[in-house]
UniProtKB/Swiss-Prot annotation:
GO cellular component, one term: cytosolic large ribosomal subunit
Gene this chain is encoded by: rplO
Feature: compositional bias, Gly residues: 21-31
One Pfam family recorded for the sequence: Ribosomal_L27A
The name this protein goes by in its record: Large ribosomal subunit protein uL15
GO molecular function terms attached to this record: rRNA binding; structural constituent of ribosome
Organism the protein comes from: Herminiimonas arsenicoxydans
Protein's job: Binds to the 23S rRNA.
Known partners and oligomeric status: Part of the 50S ribosomal subunit.
Database matches in PANTHER family: 50S RIBOSOMAL PROTEIN L15, LARGE RIBOSOMAL SUBUNIT PROTEIN UL15M
Keyword DNA damage: no
Family: Belongs to the universal ribosomal protein uL15 family.
Disordered: region residues: 1-52
Amino acid sequence: MELNTIQPADGAKHYKRRVGRGIGSGLGKTAGRGHKGQKSRSGGFHKVGFEGGQMPLQRRLPKRGFKSLATPYKAEVRLSDLEALPVTEIDILALKQAGVIGELARVVRVILSGELTKKVTLKGLIATKGAKAAIEAAGGSVA
């Protein structure tokens, strides 16, 4: 075996089928597009969501709700997330560094979900009644 004779194993490579290259290729003349019609033409295909002139579903259904611009600035943290953190004094910066909340978060709310067994001190965070009770029961505090 020499470097100039190396080639892939049989069946390892599938060559792209070239269409429109004569009768003998099996995909000449119409190139697998059939005869006439919009889909046989070059550039002949409809837009995504086009339903042949019928009013599209996206326009038939009413508009509903809105997307709050405040969403990226708010975040919720579970007690189980606090349990997993290596630090005991928890503020927004500690949560961002641990990747628990997004970089844009400004208002963080701790909710009662999961269990907390270690003593933690919250600074600058909002806690729900249940979460506050659970934190204090574990010997921690909410400042």
